Swiss-Prot record:
The keyword Membrane applies. The lineage of its organism: Viruses, Varidnaviria, Bamfordvirae, Nucleocytoviricota, Pokkesviricetes. Component of the virion core. Participates in virion assembly. Residues 80-101, 140-180 are annotated as: Disordered. It comes from the Viruses. GO terms for cellular component: host cell endoplasmic reticulum-Golgi intermediate compartment membrane; membrane; virion component. Interacts with OPG136 and its cleaved form. This is 39kDa core protein OPG130. It comes from Variola virus (isolate Human/India/Ind3/1967).
Length: 271
């Protein structure tokens, strides 16, 4: 019986050495450690991939909402400004050699001021000095009397009478040209958001007229140049923004490639 027990104990020691038991336990610890590292790497990989996918989706949305803007051509609408029609000016009075008709007109005008009949003044104003006084008074009255008008820049015609050497009286009235209506131009430019911005400018042919807009007498050509300059600047800013989005997308793609290469390197290292 003792012999059998010794034989069994020796057989067990020879078939399962202690070193193999220790080796198997150490190998199990290494396997568990490698599995924990692999699980951690996979979780980190999934986290970074999810973050990169979300960032890439946001970049794609920004790039889609900010596409390059085509150059927009401004639309010009020119509408004439309605101005009050000036009062018709009387035709210039033709020179007349009939002294009696001119004298009667002057007597009628003088009688309207003095509330007297022209027939009573006719025999009393026959001397030459009296005629000169009447003409001087008539011309002075024409220069000092003004008619109210809605256009202060418009000059009223003045009738001037003179006595010729032969005793005849001639009256002349200069022709006054009415002012030209100003030119009004409206520039409408579409905006990237879908709206429209309109700017109105007035170009008055009269050099002494003041502008009704807050453009400080800006010419239409200068206004168009300013609008085109602003559009070119807006186009350049938009192109820079789109380029930055494309660069961010390329950087994200390269970062994903680097992470994938790192993961493959860990896998080869584990093998």
């Amino acid at each position: 019986m003792d012999f059998f027990n010794k034989f069994s104990q020796g057989l067990a020691e020879s078939s399962t050495p202690k070193s193999s038991i220790y080796y198997s336990e150490e190998k199990d610890l290494d396997i568990k450690k490698d599995e924990a590292i692999e699980i951690g790497l996979k979780s980190q990989e999934s986290y970074y991939q999810r973050q990169l996918r979300e960032q890439l989706a946001r970049d794609n949305m920004m790039a889609a909402s900010r596409q390059p803007i085509q150059p927009l051509q401004p639309t010009i609408h020119i509408t004439p400004l309605q101005v009050p029609t000036p009062a018709p000016t009387p035709k210039p009075r033709q020179q007349q050699t009939n002294t009696s008709s001119d004298m009667s007109n002057l007597f009628d005008w003088l009688s309207a001021d003095d509330n007297t009949q022209p027939s009573s003044l006719l025999p009393a104003l026959t001397p030459i000095n009296a005629v000169q006084d009447i003409i001087s008074k008539f011309n002075k009255d024409q220069k000092t009397t003004t008619t109210p008008s809605t256009q202060p820049s418009q000059t009223l015609p003045t009738t001037t009478c003179t006595q010729q050497s032969d005793g005849s009286i001639s009256c002349t009235t200069p022709t006054v040209t009415p002012p030209q209506p100003p030119i009004v131009a409206t520039v409408c430019t579409p905006t990237p958001t879908g709206g429209t911005v309109c700017t109105t400018a007035q170009q008055n042919p009269n050099p002494g007229a003041t502008s009704q807009q807050n453009l400080d007498n800006m010419a239409l050509k200068d206004l168009m140049s300013s609008v085109e300059k602003d559009m070119r600047q807006l186009q350049a800013e938009t192109n820079d923004l789109v380029t930055n989005v494309y660069d961010a997308r390329e950087y994200t793609r390269r970062a994903i490639d680097q992470i994938l290469q790192l993961v493959k390197g860990f896998e080869r290292f584990q093998k």
